[in-house]
Amino acid sequence: MSQQLSSQTPSNQDRIVGKHVFGNLYDIDDKLLMDKDLLEGLVLEAVKIAKMNLVEIKSWSFGGKKGGVSVIALVEESHIALHTWNEYKYATLDVYTCGVDSNPQAAFEFIVSNLKPKRHQMFFADRSSE
Amino acid sequence: MSQQLSSQTPSNQDRIVGKHVFGNLYDIDDKLLMDKDLLEGLVLEAVKIAKMNLVEIKSWSFGGKKGGVSVIALVEESHIALHTWNEYKYATLDVYTCGVDSNPQAAFEFIVSNLKPKRHQMFFADRSSE
């Protein structure tokens, strides 16, 4: 009986559980979106909130009208990516985590609550193996 | 008249055009999914096919049952992320590009055609500013 239940509901031990929360963040204070250190700090904190293990984090600044900041954190074995465009007061955020106990939505909401976009969207994609 | 049309259909010069193609790739030859150099080479070629400008590419190998390879390319100003789990013959792929002329779908399909998953999904998310 338990074996039958097990085959109907595969154990999370037997597959990769991938959770990807992503969205677009509109109308943000442009000064925040130029502050590479602040943005990297938010992503670092988000890694903890999502219950992920950080492997490496890196950030870059880009000049020009369509410039801004990119922060990418590699975690085991997925990523957080935050891209900003200060002239457009715009940012996009992807929080992709692995593991049944990870919480990408909490990490996404943490960054949103700090950047305070006037509008934003949040979507979920299942990145699990079969 | 042209001004009116312009306000109805905003010029792509006036906003960030972000295109994100992503999906899960099932049942891949596990030897391919352990070959960090091969996977990094595929992502580098995909950057060109998508008509993106590479800023930096990096790859990592992870051991253990849930290990594999991660390759992340930062491009101006978005990313390609390929994560693999060889024990599960599984990979996920995100090709997120900026610019009206970029072609993330061609890059996605290039990597799929090389990894030859028995099944895969492909989704599109609009990451453009308003």
Swiss-Prot record, chains A, B:
Keywords: Autocatalytic cleavage, Decarboxylase, Lyase, Polyamine biosynthesis, Pyruvate, Schiff base, Zymogen. Its EC number is 4.1.1.19. Its cofactor is pyruvate. This is Arginine decarboxylase proenzyme. It catalyses: L-arginine + H(+) = agmatine + CO2. It is an enzyme of class 4 (lyase). The record marks 77-78 as: Cleavage (non-hydrolytic). The modification Pyruvic acid (Ser) is found at residue 78. Binds 1 pyruvoyl group covalently per subunit. InterPro entries: AdoMetDC_fam_prok, ArgDC, S-AdoMet_deCO2ase_core, S-AdoMet_deCOase_pro-enz. Transmembrane segments: none annotated. Belongs to the prokaryotic AdoMetDC family. Type 1 subfamily. GO terms for molecular function: arginine decarboxylase activity. The active site is at 78 (schiff-base intermediate with substrate), 83 (proton acceptor), 98 (proton donor). Pfam families: AdoMet_dc. Pathway: Amine and polyamine biosynthesis; agmatine biosynthesis; agmatine from L-arginine: step 1/1. GO terms for biological process: arginine catabolic process; polyamine biosynthetic process. Is synthesized initially as an inactive proenzyme. Formation of the active enzyme involves a self-maturation process in which the active site pyruvoyl group is generated from an internal serine residue via an autocatalytic post-translational modification. Two non-identical subunits are generated from the proenzyme in this reaction, and the pyruvate is formed at the N-terminus of the alpha chain, which is derived from the carboxyl end of the proenzyme. Heterooctamer of four alpha and four beta chains arranged as a tetramer of alpha/beta heterodimers. PANTHER family: S-ADENOSYLMETHIONINE DECARBOXYLASE PROENZYME. One of its GO terms (cellular component) is cytosol.
